[in-house]
Amino acid sequence: MDEVGAQVAAPMFIHQSLGRKRDLYYPMSNRLVQSQPQRRDEWNSKMWDWDSRRFEAKPVDVEVQEFDLTLRNRSGEERGLDLNLGSGLTAVEETTTTTQNVRPNKKVRSGSPGGNYPMCQVDNCTEDLSHAKDYHRRHKVCEVHSKATKALVGKQMQRFCQQCSRFHLLSEFDEGKRSCRRRLAGHNRRRRKTTQPEEVASGVVVPGNHDTTNNTANANMDLMALLTALACAQGKNAVKPPVGSPAVPDREQLLQILNKINALPLPMDLVSKLNNIGSLARKNMDHPTVNPQNDMNGASPSTMDLLAVLSTTLGSSSPDALAILSQGGFGNKDSEKTKLSSYENGVTTNLEKRTFGFSSVGGERSSSSNQSPSQDSDSRGQDTRSSLSLQLFTSSPEDESRPTVASSRKYYSSASSNPVEDRSPSSSPVMQELFPLQASPETMRSKNHKNSSPRTGCLPLELFGASNRGAADPNFKGFGQQSGYASSGSDYSPPSLNSDAQDRTGKIVFKLLDKDPSQLPGTLRSEIYNWLSNIPSEMESYIRPGCVVLSVYVAMSPAAWEQLEQKLLQRLGVLLQNSPSDFWRNARFIVNTGRQLASHKNGKVRCSKSWRTWNSPELISVSPVAVVAGEETSLVVRGRSLTNDGISIRCTHMGSYMAMEVTRAVCRQTIFDELNVNSFKVQNVHPGFLGRCFIEVENGFRGDSFPLIIANASICKELNRLGEEFHPKSQDMTEEQAQSSNRGPTSREEVLCFLNELGWLFQKNQTSELREQSDFSLARFKFLLVCSVERDYCALIRTLLDMLVERNLVNDELNREALDMLAEIQLLNRAVKRKSTKMVELLIHYLVNPLTLSSSRKFVFLPNITGPGGITPLHLAACTSGSDDMIDLLTNDPQEIGLSSWNTLRDATGQTPYSYAAIRNNHNYNSLVARKLADKRNKQVSLNIEHEVVDQTGLSKRLSLEMNKSSSSCASCATVALKYQRRVSGSQRLFPTPIIHSMLAVATVCVCVCVFMHAFPIVRQGSHFSWGGLDYGSI
């Protein structure tokens, strides 16, 4: 019986070990562990409501119920998360329960939270655990929440740890791991132990240990392995290694060897020196070092030199290695979470702590310099600071969160021609300092900074290739011209606007590692806004999983964007210093501004040097550029590098995002990649919605975006004509047409600026509860109104004017600032010059207060409104040929101001519209106005009906002349035009062809009748019949 008892006890002991789940059933290789699939999301975006304007996250009320139903409905979708707890332990449940006393760290909990049956401890979960497994009853967790990636426990998002058997915050878990980071660290340490205890003891050489037999052998093997790796890195692979030498170590072995080297203690004399350096450095820092002893135990100089050489050779020998490590570090199509945490258990943290006290030698480069990769690493001292495991972020003196005096002098202004020249901190740069390191009241932007703009001269309107290229000298000569000047009215063109003065919309991406939306501070928006020195005119954001990826769309001036990217490291230091909370100082995050990439960890900021070498996608256009709210449509996305592996395309709108399924376009010869998005529809919008969304394309941590306007059908029809600006058919345009269109290389940037500004206004119209400063400045309204008039966007102009009136209406009238702005841009003059009858009719009849009585209605655009030189729309139309419709519209205004002012309204030179028309021989204009005045006096209505006979010969000549003008477009068109011209010229006779055909038909009938009448027909009687013998009479 004793033997039987012994045989029974052994399986019970094994089952108890399996229940702890602290050891694997069998040894698993690193390759198998790394190839396990990992879940992408740590939190569900549908469970959080994100305010894109306030930067605030609120949990959804029914998030737990919906999440539970989703998990319960899954059938075998994530079988890799099954715990298989308690299987095979039915016979020994009592034994397992009694053995819990042996494990004091395992807390035995009561089965019920206050009821008659045990329930799950997750909030709002009423799962009955009476018939559940013993494991679930003891730990008060149901099977669904034990496998869930997150659950709401105590009003906090947590996750159940399978090794601790309790709930922890999401920040204590790595991506896809079912156990907390603390348990995994101990588990990884046990797995890295070798099978022989003496080899474990020889991993660290302790002074005074004279038993150096195994230590010397292991040290020699490690040294040989490092030399072999260095030889392979220097291209000496052809040399056959000697017999008995170790093979080339892999990455894990190199990390273990470096970890052993870093564990070596420093000599006593060097320790004393480091003590002095560390004390001096701590005096310059605002917050003391938590553990000064860790900073003193740095690596020896020889170790640092070895690490620098190894890091440099590995980086230079494999150019593609950085890209692979970078894409793996910032996410790809399989995972969006940064894998930097995989190095935390190795040598990375120790290396960063030990390199604090060393100073580099030589100059530092600016973070915005456009240099080659070889020029970026021209300093040996900078390479010495490199770390093997964090090769992507090169440590340098400018990487510190707070620049010191010694390092701040190495930042050069944009005006310096010598990159090695030392400049003192007090030297003032040429460019205006938009981002000062210390915030001061002088750097605050005034509220009316964008409301006031200087009066411009009389410049020709060339925005978006307008047809004003024939305007005269912008410095108009106006006020003293002679009456005989032939084209006095055309010399007073409306002032031009430049899109370069408008803000540029860009994106700043923050990847907050080990965070979830519940940990974001309530002052997040104000902190980012203050970090940018209160410069942005607009800010909008959204979040998505992958820790927390915060994408912030910012509208700033181009100069502000340039300075932010040039001094990104300094600006991040200001963010860490001036933040009112400890959120940024205690967080690990990565910042991407589009051209620069930087990271923060343990109080240090680093810039990526290999960021420019990545193959990033680029969006050229999205067609159509505007979609109707609530309707389904198809999109065509064009750009570069859109078909590479790892590309993801999404649509972001109002704080949420939606992944889009794309298909490759039909193969054809194009210079861009084309992707089709079928069945695209913006969710949760009503039919009259006005807004904007972004189409984003991303590869890893770098991407591009394009604005997409959401509006009604009439506005979308007008805006979709902008698609031609992104892909002009230059091969079908002649030189004269290209000059007349005036579409240079800046056309795409101007159109993007117009779409972005229009999108910001539409977004503000939907989120009117958040009014910032002046809401939307008059200068930005000016830019949108001018662009819309120059494009003949009548529906858009009416919408913009309504929004302008809504924001500037005082006592049923526009305020003085808005009236001055409208008088400055002269919308009616622009429409008259473009001969846009629909736009002129819209502006003439536009009412500020349409709901009031007719006697108190206010019209803004009057025909007699004066511009530069006293020129009015009547003067401008009178001196323009072919403007009969313009004269008719301007003299048919509701208040009849144009009709009564035709003969009396004078400009600065004393000329009236009547004299303008007479000088340009447009006498029909004067006749038209005179007839209308006569009808008004006689209270009658007269109609002018003209009968015009089109000369076929003249029409043929005009057609041939037009074909000759356009015959130089291409060879095929010239051939067709030549044939058409010959055919027309050959058919020119005395009589036109239709008349000849009619004459021939009549002649044919006459001949037939004559022949029939004069013939001698045969009669039945046989006698001849003669027409001459016939007589007439009654029958």
Curated annotation (Swiss-Prot):
Subcellular location: Nucleus; Cytoplasm
Low complexity compositional bias, start-end: 359-376, 406-417
Domain of life: Eukaryota
InterPro entries attached to this UniProt entry: Ankyrin_rpt-contain_sf, SBP-like, SBP_dom, SBP_sf
Keyword flag Transcription regulation: yes
Cofactor binding description: Binds 2 Zn(2+) ions per subunit.
Tissue specificity field: Expressed in vasculature of aerial parts. Expressed in cotyledons and leaf petioles.
Ranges of the ANK repeats in the UniProt entry: 780-809, 823-853, 869-899
Chief location of this protein within or outside the cell: nucleus
Region span, Disordered: 186-213, 358-459, 473-500, 727-746
List of residues binding Zn(2+) 2: 161, 164, 168, 180
Ribosomal protein found in the keyword field: no
A cellular component annotation (GO) from this entry: nucleus
ZnF endpoints (SBP-type): 117-194
Gene Ontology MF annotations: DNA binding; DNA-binding transcription factor activity; zinc ion binding
Keywords: ANK repeat, Cytoplasm, DNA-binding, Metal-binding, Nucleus, Repeat, Transcription, Transcription regulation, Zinc, Zinc-finger
Mutant lacking the gene: phenotype: Plants display elongated petioles and enhanced leaf margin serration and are able to germinate and develop in the presence of the programmed cell death (PCD)-inducing fungal toxin fumonisin B1 (FB1).
Span(s) of short sequence motif Bipartite nuclear localization signal: 177-193
Protein residues bound to Zn(2+) 1: 120, 125, 142, 145
Task performed by this protein: Trans-acting factor that binds specifically to the consensus nucleotide sequence 5'-TNCGTACAA-3'. May play a role in plant development.
Domain notes: The SBP-type zinc finger is required for the binding to DNA.
Identification of the protein by name: Squamosa promoter-binding-like protein 14
